[in-house]
Every structure is written in structure tokens, then in C-alpha cells.
């Protein structure tokens, strides 16, 4: 699916009704929120870097969504998008983030000492633990809209900045352009590297332009702390390791992330943040903390139980297949993570994962012994 260049005034020769996209078969947040009135009001506006309403919505027009999975259907091309096109983004954000209002303020908490427990998840069930977030560099357009020069600047800032990390964070940068196909595939299979840009959502939003120019992966020597450069966001920061010690994974995440932010601020390049949206990222689904704390957990009995989806809903968690979003679970191994990004702090979100997964393991053990789990079903968080 090619990226349609929509940055032009030519279409203003046609009325809003003539240009309004056909969203009759769509199941995404953008399609739900976009009315002809909103389209009419916003279609001739653009951000300082030239991103238009049609650029915002194109990925959601081209990808109607899935009957059972509500996708977001819009992206931001720069920091100003969320303000210039707020008539569309505000209802999308409110819908996607459980009623988060335009007047609400987000909270940030990256103090790892505030996490309770998390070092005792049973490694016979919890196979690996991971925490990730995204960060955007102020003053540079986001991946759907950035120029080649901007993208290369992001890469240069990352290479120079990350090279100064020491101790457990000492590592090396590997540009995608010099990697062999076999090396790339190995890193993807090991869950260290982002996939090749085959996702229609990525392609239709313009994020895959000039691939693999300016993209790469940096990781520390232990491969337990990684930074993806110029995929869906300028930076994706990831802390991960085998087993169930989420406390250690979160400690490394918080310490490493603070070090990276200090490096960028020192270079005169802070991250996009405001008190309403928290950290500003490309996809509205990641606003706030941008954090996804996830574990791979083996739950062959619980995953077949009729109450499984109810347990997930009540603990504010979501499940994905073993390989991440849009994949199947292999050998009853699920990727369980926090459903929220906005309105809860980093500590609160990881706490939900720790508490919820601990409960799921307890349920799995009960079911192994043929016992009921009805008394373990939690109240709604």
C-alpha cells in the first residue's frame, strides 16, 4: 500500500462533502469521531511543519480496522497536531483512554522504589518480562512526516548521546542499513528488533518512507536495555530480561530512561511533553506514559477458561499473542500487559501488571489441580 501524498491545497477546489472519506465500513476511533462538520472545520488547517487533517486520518481511511479490534486510525505528524486538530484528537483520546477529558492532567512517576513487589513472579509460568516506552525529540517532525534530514538528525543525536552511557548501560549502535537480512531476522526473532515495515498501518501513515535510512537499534552489552531509533517513534526505550523479575526490569528502565533524558536535555534537545497529554508520541494510543509493561506468561488452563477475558478487563490488562500485536499465542504463552497509557503513572501501570499476573499464575495453579477460581475473580480496578 503506497503512501499517498496528501499535502496539497488542490483538493480545496472541491467541497468538504465531495472530499469526505467513506467511513461506512470502518471500525476505528478516528472513523467514530470524524464528522463532516469536523472535517469541514479542519481540512484547510495545517501545522507549522505542513501536516494536514488528511495526513492525520489517511492510515485510518486505508485501514478500516477489524470487526473485533478497535484500532486508532490516526497519527500525529508533529507536536502541534494534537492542538491544531484537537477537535478530532480530543474525542479519539477520550474514547481510547477510558474517558480521559481535554481538561485532565497526566501524572508521571519514574521512581522505581514506589513499585511494590514484582521480584517474585513464578519463573515456571512467567518466561520473560519487559517494559517499553517511546520518546519524541522537541522541534523535530514525527516519523509520519519527518524529512530525511530530520530522521538522520534523530539518528545522529542518538548515536552521539547513547555512546556516552557507561556501566550496565554501555553498548553499541547497529544501523539497519549495514545489517544483513540474516542478522536482522535473528534480532527480530529474539524480540530485540522491530519488524520489517510490512504493517499496512505503518505504510499508510508514511512511517516507512526511505526505509531503512536512519533506522537502527542500540543495545547495552547484556542486551537487557535497548533503544529502537526511528521506527514508529523517534526513540523506543526497552528494558527486558528472561524470567519474572519485573522489579529489576523496571529499575533498569527508570534509571536508563532518566540518563537518556539528561543526555538529550544537555544537548539542548528535550522530549515532547505537556501536562495534559504527558509524553507526546506518534500514535494517540501511546500518549501519557507511552509505557507498556508486559510479560510472557504460560497459562494453558486459564486461557481456555470462560472468565479469562473478564479477569483481563477487571485487572485493566490486555493480551496479545506470543509474537506481539496481531499474532497467535504459541503453546498457550500470552503477552500480558497494561491496557492504559494515559491518566495513570508509570509505577501504577507496572503495578497493575505485577498484581494482575501474580493473580493469573495463582488461578492457573488452581485450575491445574481441578479447583474452582470463582473466589479469586477480582473486583474492577
Swiss-Prot record:
Residue span, Phosphagen kinase N-terminal domain: 11-98
EC numbers, comma separated: 2.7.3.2
Top-level taxonomic group: Eukaryota
Gene Ontology terms: biological process: phosphocreatine biosynthetic process
Location of this chain's protein in the cell: Cytoplasm
One Gene Ontology CC term in the entry: cytoplasm
Entries under Pfam families matching the protein: ATP-gua_Ptrans, ATP-gua_PtransN
GO MF assignments: ATP binding; creatine kinase activity
InterPro entries to which the protein is assigned, alphabetical: ATP-guanido_PTrfase, ATP-guanido_PTrfase_AS, ATP-guanido_PTrfase_cat, ATP-guanido_PTrfase_N, ATP-guanido_PTrfase_N_sf, Gln_synth/guanido_kin_cat_dom
Catalytic activity: creatine + ATP = N-phosphocreatine + ADP + H(+)
Binding positions (ATP): 128-132, 191, 236, 292, 320-325, 335
Function: Reversibly catalyzes the transfer of phosphate between ATP and various phosphogens (e.g. creatine phosphate). Creatine kinase isoenzymes play a central role in energy transduction in tissues with large, fluctuating energy demands, such as skeletal muscle, heart, brain and spermatozoa.
Subunit structure: Dimer of identical or non-identical chains. With MM being the major form in skeletal muscle and myocardium, MB existing in myocardium, and BB existing in many tissues, especially brain.
Protein family membership: Belongs to the ATP:guanido phosphotransferase family.
Protein name in the entry: Creatine kinase M-type
